[in-house]
Structure formats: C-alpha cells, structure tokens
Amino acid sequence: MSDGLAERMKLYESAEAGRRLMPLLPALARLDGRAFGSFTRNLARPFDERLSRLMIETCVTLVTETGSTVGYTQSDEITLAWVPEAFDSQIFFDGRVQKMCSGLAALATAHFARRLPAFLPTEFAERVPTFDCRVWNVPTLEEAANVLVWRELDATKNSIAMAARAHYPHAAVHGKSGAEMQELLFQKGVNWNDYPAFFKRGTYVRRLKEARPFTASELEALPPKHAARANPALVVERIACAPEELPPIVRVTNRAGVLFRGEAPRADFT
C-alpha cells in the first residue's frame, strides 16, 4: 500500500511540478523585488546609486551561478536569458519551471540580503527584501532580444517619470508624456540626458571569454607540477561575467547577435 500511495502522491506532484521549458528555444526569466517601494523608503530619489550597484552585483551573481547567456537589470528587476546550443543543452534546473522560479528567487534574495549591509545603512539590513520570479520560452533569438528591448524601453520610461517625481508633486506629473516630463525637468534646470546610463537604460551583464595569465593567488593554489609554475606568463582562457555598457539596444540593428553571440554592435542613430 505504501508503494501505491507514494506513486499516487508523486503523480499529483509531477502533474504540475514536472513542467519543463521547451528545449532548443531561448528561455527567459524575470525577477522582481517584492514591495521594494516600502523597502526603499528614505533612499535618495530619483535613484540611489548604492542600491543600483547592489542590483548590478546581484545580476552578475545570477549570470555566474545559473549559466545564463546574458543578464539585464534596471530598477528592482533582473532579466536573464539562456540560449541553448543543442537539443540536450542544459539550462538552469534542466528547464524545470517551478524549480527555476523558486531557485532563482531564492538565489537573488540570498545574495541581495547577504550583501545588503555592505551597501546600505543598518536600518535597511533589518528589512526583509525578497524577489519573485517567472520563466518562459520565446520562439526565436530575435524575440529573446526583443524581451530585453521591452525592458530597456520600460527602464527609460520609468526613469523619466522617477526624475520628474523627484522634483514635482505627483499631481503635477500625472498623465504627462515623457516629453512633457522632460520639459518640466528643464524648468528646474535638470537635463534627463545627464543622468547615468544605468539609471536611464539599465545595465547588461554578459558571459565573455577572456585570455589572461594566472593571478598571483591563482598561481599559489596550483599543483606544484602545473606548467604555469615554471611559466607564470602562461595564458589561460576563462569565462568572466561582468557588466557591459551597450548603446541603446533598440537602436542596435544586430541586437540578437550582440546579446547572444558576442558580435560588435551596429547601431542605427538616424
């Protein structure tokens, strides 16, 4: 009876928990800070660079730990993309939807909370920031790139609104277009274009190959007979995950190649 019970319970569980993303298709995840409006109370407006740097570091950690091809962060959200190379390519948690959602949310929350005291005062460390997550497939690389276009355009729209609200009461900017809010900012002597790129458009994080010699600490940790012991100039190829400044991605004509294949951007500024 116990075997039958176990099988039946597993059947119930797997009916939903066993769902996987489709192989070969690009996979996306988006994480959002939960109730960050309350969490960020009393921080500098329209943005606090300390919080922005912590979000970028959290994004770097997620790209590093999950093997995602590219990451993107703006405000209190992070987007990740995986581009499978073959049918049996492994992505995070083998594409299991519920495990990806719970694992990514837990990883982001744990890193953010652990590093929070290094970036923000003690009063913020006593709060409990958390992230939620959703994952999905898109049919093509171009659509995967368009997800990031969507998020970058959202970042631009939100940054204009946040800048305007930092200088005007809500009623003065309610219902105004982006151009109208920028005009209001000009009246206060503020040029939205002068804000840093991470606030206006967000930040991309990519996995890039780099060839470099071992560092002193890496050399120390090598086995005694390793070739680099005799030749410290020996170059090693590694994968590094780091922020990368890109032109506005909506203007990049080969954006899928730039984001997922490491191509140099070709931008249309007409």
Placement of each model-derived feature along the sequence:
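Regulatory and interdomain segments flanking nucleotide-handling catalytic cores
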Residues: 1-270
